[in-house]
């Protein structure tokens, strides 16, 4: 080969390489494994494009006709080595079903972010992928984590005026966002004519919900002149169909507060006497246990949408939570799984329905709102995720008011022997509800102090202070206040008789502070004349110069020990059983 032929060959190879690079789609051209990716696309006929920090393979696949696959067809793939790409992932995941779309999250340096989403054409293929490919060894010693993806299409919107109806909320949300399918609004437990100040908005896709969330972030848009709070709603728990076919417990919501468990049992047991085993009502919702699933389904179909005591009922099958998932939630709430599980206790324990509580507002609720440990375990106020529109990996997700399931009955602490019975606490202030920042809450209760006597039958404590130092001061202030109360007339005669028999006479007028008998009060500076002031000292005042009077000497329990200390020790405070003496203010002395 001559030099001219070699140059021509090199020129031809360069041109071919340039043409190949020109045909490579964006995101593939210049990739470390460009040749392998191009070979994959040539073999499968799929297309590939990179946008918004993710590289999409397929979506839809070649020859696809019809709508997007239904919800539940997507799986989350985690623990991907950062130098593994579609040429290695696609052969693994297409072995269990036809791939509709694979989205690999990418970094700016060309490596992946360690996770991806794979959407199959059918729901059964996604379930098979979870069963067979979880812990699949993609490389020696490197295992993939595969689980169902939470394709969340629902937003939580708080700060809505309570007088707005569902139709008004739907119309207003549709004006500022696109892809709105439905709005779920709950009536107030106390007043069915009002809503609870929040709503759930269902969108046609996760992307539409993510774009709406970005647009409605606090500070950007106001609804009806009100600031709103927006976040992802807690996704509905996807329970296996085989498990749901065995459920014989109904979840009933939108009950009146006054409705009793007996009324519910009578209403749901009308179709087959004795079919209802038990009813557990919590505020405005209840769980109804049936002896058989057939009776439960019959009652659900017959009573859903009917009225009970003036309220329209919503009846669905209760959703049990997977035991492993519940255990993970418990460990996360206690600090990342480091704490040991509580000892099983007998009996049923129901989780409180979070949407029955008041809405505290954004962002205060993220710090001290009700059911805080529901959303603190994974972070409360979350920003944008690493991927486009945020990650949809499973696990405890942060949300306002502890997260909602939009009316779906979930008895996560419903299983027998799963919960820990709550102990009765002590009442600081009657009828005071305290929102605790930590999981240890102060519950209402009553404690009697018999030693205080009938004169002071009730002590009203101050509201719990925020700071420890304030608490030290408040304790003394609010213990002194009840002591300053005058004696009640019923015990006046007994007090007068006791005072007459006392060693030291009582004062004739009620003192400003009176309480349990105390010993005489002495001056604190010896040999210094006090400034005379009329009425400054009470009748029980004993001067420092003459402590060992005959009257006081009779009260000494140890005269020998008292003599060592100059006659000031050894007095018996109990020797003043009924004396009511005045506590003098501080002695006033001239300055030096």
From Swiss-Prot:
Single annotated GO MF: mRNA binding
GO cellular component terms listed in the entry, alphabetical order: cytoplasm; nucleus
InterPro entries: HnRNP_R/Q_splicing_fac, Nucleotide-bd_a/b_plait_sf, RBD_domain_sf, RBM47_RRM2, RBM47_RRM3, RRM_dom
Swiss-Prot/TrEMBL GO biological process terms: mRNA processing; RNA splicing
Subcellular location: Nucleus; Cytoplasm
Compositionally skewed regions (Low complexity) per UniProt: 1-24
Modified residues (Asymmetric dimethylarginine): 397, 408
Residues of the RRM domain: 73-151, 153-235, 248-320
Keywords: Cytoplasm, Methylation, mRNA processing, mRNA splicing, Nucleus, Repeat, RNA-binding
PROSITE patterns the record matches: RRM
Region annotated Disordered, chain positions: 1-26
Omega-N-methylarginine carried by residues: 397, 408
Family the UniProt entry places it in: Belongs to the RRM RBM47 family.
Assembly: Homodimer. Interacts with A1CF. Interacts with APOBEC1; form an mRNA editing complex. Interacts with RBPMS.
Protein task: Single-stranded RNA-binding protein that functions in a variety of RNA processes, including alternative splicing, RNA stabilization, and RNA editing. Functions as an enzyme-substrate adapter for the cytidine deaminase APOBEC1. With APOBEC1 forms an mRNA editing complex involved into cytidine to uridine editing of a variety of mRNA molecules. Through the binding of their 3'UTR, also stabilizes a variety of mRNAs and regulates the expression of genes such as the interferon alpha/beta receptor and interleukin-10. Also involved in the alternative splicing of several genes including TJP1.
Domain notes: The RRM domains are required for mRNA stabilization.
Protein name per the record: RNA-binding protein 47
Organism of this sequence: Canis lupus familiaris (Dog)
Gene name in the database record: RBM47
């Amino acid at each position: 080969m001559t030099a001219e032929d070699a140059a021509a060959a090199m020129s031809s190879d360069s041109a071919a390489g340039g043409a190949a690079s020109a045909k490579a789609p964006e995101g593939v051209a210049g990739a470390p494994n460009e040749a392998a990716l191009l070979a994959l696309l040539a073999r499968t006929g799929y297309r590939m494009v990179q946008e918004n920090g993710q590289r999409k393979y397929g979506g839809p696949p070649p020859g696809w006709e019809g709508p997007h696959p239904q919800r539940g067809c997507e799986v989350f793939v985690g623990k991907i080595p950062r130098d593994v790409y579609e040429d290695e992932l696609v052969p693994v995941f297409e072995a269990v079903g036809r791939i509709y779309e694979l989205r690999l999250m990418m970094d700016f340096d060309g490596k992946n972010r360690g996770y991806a989403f794979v959407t199959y054409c059918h729901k059964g293929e996604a379930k098979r992928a979870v069963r067979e490919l979880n812990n699949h060894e993609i490389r020696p010693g490197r295992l993939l984590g595969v689980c169902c993806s939470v394709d969340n299409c629902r937003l939580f919107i708080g700060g809505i005026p309570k007088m707005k109806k569902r139709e008004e909320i739907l119309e207003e949300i549709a004006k500022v966002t696109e892809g709105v399918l439905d709005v779920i609004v709950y009536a107030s437990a106390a007043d069915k004519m009002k809503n609870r100040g929040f709503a759930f908005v269902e969108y046609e896709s996760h992307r539409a919900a993510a774009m709406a969330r970005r647009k409605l972030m606090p500070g950007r848009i106001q609804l009806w002149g009100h600031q709103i709070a927006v976040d992802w709603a807690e996704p509905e728990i996807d329970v296996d169909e085989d498990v749901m076919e065995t459920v014989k417990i109904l979840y009933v919501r939108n009950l009146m507060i006054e409705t009793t468990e007996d009324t519910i049992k009578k209403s749901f047991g009308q179709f087959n006497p004795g079919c209802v085993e038990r009813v557990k009502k919590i505020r405005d919702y209840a769980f109804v246990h049936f002896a058989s699933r057939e009776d439960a389904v019959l009652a659900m179909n017959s009573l859903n949408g009917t009225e009970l005591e003036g309220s329209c009922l919503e009846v669905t099958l209760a959703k049990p939570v997977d035991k492993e998932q519940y255990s993970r939630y418990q460990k996360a709430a206690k600090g990342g799984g480091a704490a040991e599980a509580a000892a099983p206790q007998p009996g049923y324990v129901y989780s409180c329905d979070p949407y029955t509580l008041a809405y505290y507002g954004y962002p205060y609720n993220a710090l001290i709102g009700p059911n805080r440990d529901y959303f603190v375990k994974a972070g409360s106020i979350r920003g944008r995720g690493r991927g486009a529109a945020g990650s949809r990996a499973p696990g405890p997700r942060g949300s306002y008011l502890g997260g909602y399931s939009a009316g779906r009955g979930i008895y996560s602490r419903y299983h027998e022997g799963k919960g820990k019975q709550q102990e009765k606490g002590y009442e600081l202030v009657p009828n005071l509800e305290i929102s605790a920042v930590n999981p240890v809450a102060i519950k209402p209760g009553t404690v009697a102090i018999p030693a205080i006597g009938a004169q002071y039958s009730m002590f009203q404590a101050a509201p719990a202070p925020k700071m420890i130092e304030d608490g030290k001061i408040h304790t003394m202030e609010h213990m002194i206040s009840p002591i300053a109360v005058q004696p009640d007339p019923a015990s006046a005669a007994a007090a007068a008789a006791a005072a007459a028999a006392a060693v030291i006479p009582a004062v004739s007028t009620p003192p400003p502070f009176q309480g349990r008998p105390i010993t005489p009060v002495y001056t604190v500076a010896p040999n210094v004349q006090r400034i005379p002031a009329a009425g400054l000292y009470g009748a029980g005042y004993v001067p420092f110069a003459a402590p060992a009077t005959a009257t006081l000497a009779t009260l000494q329990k140890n005269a020998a020990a008292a003599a060592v200390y100059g006659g000031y020790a050894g007095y018996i405070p109990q020797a003043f059983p009924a004396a009511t003496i005045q506590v003098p203010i501080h002695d006033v002395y001239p300055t030096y």
